[in-house]
Amino acid sequence: MDYKDTLLLPNTTFAMRANLAELEPKRFDKWFENNYAYEKMKQKRQGVSESFTLHDGPPYANGHLHIGHALNKILKDIIIKMHYFQGKKVRFTPGWDCHGLPIEQQVEVKLKDKKQNLSKKQIRELCREHAREFVNIQRDEFKSLGVIADWDEPYLTMKNAFEADIYKALCKIAKKGLLLERSKPVFWSWAAKSALAEAEVEYEEKEDYSIYVAFNLDEASCKKLGVENAKAVIWTTTPWTLPANQAISLNPNEKYIITKEGYIFAKALLENMINKNFTQGEIQKELLGSEFENLSAINPLNQRKSTLILGEHVLMDGGTGLVHTAPGHGEDDYYACLKYNIEVIMPVDDGGYYDETLRAKGLLPEHLLAEFIGLHIFKANERILELLGEALLESSKFTHSYPFCWRTHKPVIYRATKQWFILMDEKKLDGKSLRELALEQLNSVKFYPESGVKRLSSMIENRPDWCISRQRDWGVPIAFFRDKKSQEVIFDDDVLDHLVGIFEKNGADAWWDLEIKDLLPPNSKYNPNNLEKVYDILDVWFDSGSTWEAVLNSARYDAGEYQASMYLEGSDQHRGWFQSSLLISTAINHKTPYKNILTHGFTVDEKGQKMSKSKGNVVLPQNVAKNYGVEILRLWIMLSDYSTDLKISDNILKQVSEQYRKIRNTIRFLLANTNDIEFVETKNFTLLDKWILMRAKIAFEICENAFEKYEFSKGFSVLLNFLSADLSGIYLDICKDRLYCNAKDDSKRVSAQSAMVLIARKLFALLAPSLTYTIDEALEHANVAIKENAKDVFDLLNKQGFEYEYKIEDELFIKSREKFFEIIDGLKKDKIIKSTLELSLQTSANELLSEDLEEIADWFMVSVVESIDEQKALAEFKIDNIGFKIVKSSLNKCPRCWKFLAKEDGCLCPRCNGVEKAKNV
């Protein structure tokens, strides 16, 4: 007789194959229809006091999403959901950075030469259209990743009210005396024709000249030094800046020597100079650097005076100890010359070409002006080397790390121009500087990983004043009026507040569209004819750094609280958004805009190399979704240590898919074997059920603690190990007999099912933030015992901890089972047995014999566990001097359960016989 139909076999409609790529979009559509999921998450937590606000760092509204975008938004989604499922009120308003050079450049590429014929208003409208287009594209792409957010009400930095809030933040900083316009060298992108902030500069390898040039000291200076002739030898890597040389800097505290040949070097670097054959090394005179102050040298290019000055920035780690100083082309140069009231000369225009300043200031001889004016600086190096003649002691090329514009990818220069700066060291904030207060406030912020605080603090400690002005069209204007005559900037409250109102209504375009008289408040005391507009725009980092003000600190968005619970971005944002947000918030409100900062690394290929189209190693999130499913991308994030760079490739995604398959199969087994449970036991568990509940509690608590610290890969590693080693590897296997063969309401069967239900509930709650799709799907197929009152995943609540606590000394259990199956592998290989059910396990272990022997037999998956007798053994082993003996069962195989417990061949064992008889009663 075939007893298969008499068994309670597992049954579930939850599919084994996930078919993610096809089915995910359908479920996502349901989540996003009428903003269902996000609105439900808000509604479910109405009246809850504990909240979590993750403030979204805005990506650029330009281009399609790459894998880094996916990593960032999915990680945010997981963390927000983790707090939601813990019972907190959560808010996540996504946003976009809509201004700035990347968008303007894309518009220029489309326009080509037509740009010259367009007004600023027309250019700005085209930029707005471009940004709007990519906001919609990226929003759809983010939604296709299953990220839950307030997609119907995102924040856009180009909205009228938003531009007004950005400008309002600028005005607040100006009123505190922290804003200053001055001429100073700043990073300048000649390719973009604009100033850059530090955060907009990236470093790449660049080949440059390394040259040593001798400047003859004038006769009066030589006389003061008591020598017939002397030459100050400088080293530079920027020959093109030599026409603008105004000084030569020396370290006041270092010793300098004049060699027999008349060359001046730092004594500490003399050996290097000998190695270069500049000198034989014979010293004519030795002096301190301070003794050279205010002497004069002659620039060999133009015969202009170059003053010898002192500066602490002169180091002894290379060169000659004498530094070519052009105050228009370097920050150290600028500050050194400032002390001596030396003029800042800037002979380079905004496109990187020499201009008429060469003629006006006599920076090159008359006969060379036609050749150099209009020449790009980087094309001038070789010609300048020729013109130096004998003054050029050495010229060579070398490769070094050099600043490049982050958007044009062209090398930048230092160029002195009139710019607007937020001052870092003016003590205007309750007697403290912005630098001091920002560093002080950072102490209240928790960083993940902890090393982030040192990184951000170091950047704040060492950063210069923040250059916030840009010479472009697409951005929020630095909308100030200047008196034409006095050049004084008007910081009048009535004027500034009136402009805020205009921007709220009409947007910042009004600054270009309206005449001055229409921008002033009614009955203004200022005569519009005496005023002119400042036409610079704000650095986009000021835009994004003000988002806390416009989004969290205004009533315009239901976006959560200021200060935000968390800012979460890539590690590059220490120098970008984290820093700009900190400075603006501290300047205005004397506190940080965030309580926690979490950073993640960058995505690289499986070899750790940066992704690029040329290498063919780019992984697109759209392709991952199409080929594997978004759930695989989410699981990849959970399994990766995101505090460092994250490796991703097809091979890695295949491995993640295999892990997902195991998780899904475990869920399926739990659903299939609890489909008919009607009563959940919470107290009277069998030994094996207590054991799995104990192991579950340990794993769940470690996992939960790791998740609380956002150490997802650590937590997931423990969770997956529990699922594969304990739950699937042991427990679910050993439970099959009682689940399939015992009576439906048998206490042992109900005990096992109940343990599975309790584990499934907690497992689903732990997985819901990361594998939201899978858990939502699983709940549709789950018995009410598992899902309780949940209609979908957004009804779940993850209660802290796991209340089912049991203490079982399982060391002997584990060790003996491992050894037993090690021996069984050999017995099966040698074809001595086909199944462990053919066996009895004999032991002298009281620890095992004192328990329910049916349970212990299930633990080893044998038919009987008993005391050791004289029966012949197939194998023997010892664990901690406790004997175990494997013998063939003396009973017969039960045709229903296959255990060797039947007294006669072909007959049912007592258990199966009882179950079948009960059905017929």
Curated annotation (Swiss-Prot):
Subcellular location: Cytoplasm
Motif 'KMSKS' region, chain ranges: 610-614
InterPro entries: aa-tRNA-synth_I_CS, aa-tRNA-synth_Ia, Anticodon_Ile_BEm, Ile-tRNA-ligase, Ile-tRNA-ligase_type1, Ile-tRNA_ligase, M/V/L/I-tRNA-synth_anticd-bd, Rossmann-like_a/b/a_fold
GO biological process, one term: isoleucyl-tRNA aminoacylation
EC number in record: 6.1.1.5
Pfam families: Anticodon_1 (PF08264), tRNA-synt_1 (PF00133)
Ligand binding (ATP): K613
Cofactor binding note of this UniProt entry: Binds 1 zinc ion per subunit.
Any Gene Ontology CC annotation: cytosol
Record motif 'HIGH' region, residues: 59-69
Function: Catalyzes the attachment of isoleucine to tRNA(Ile). As IleRS can inadvertently accommodate and process structurally similar amino acids such as valine, to avoid such errors it has two additional distinct tRNA(Ile)-dependent editing activities. One activity is designated as 'pretransfer' editing and involves the hydrolysis of activated Val-AMP. The other activity is designated 'posttransfer' editing and involves deacylation of mischarged Val-tRNA(Ile).
HAMAP family from the UniProt entry: Ile_tRNA_synth_type1
Similarity comment: family membership: Belongs to the class-I aminoacyl-tRNA synthetase family. IleS type 1 subfamily.
Protein name: Isoleucine--tRNA ligase
Source organism: Campylobacter lari (strain RM2100 / D67 / ATCC BAA-1060)
Upper classification of the organism: Bacteria, Pseudomonadati, Campylobacterota, Epsilonproteobacteria, Campylobacterales
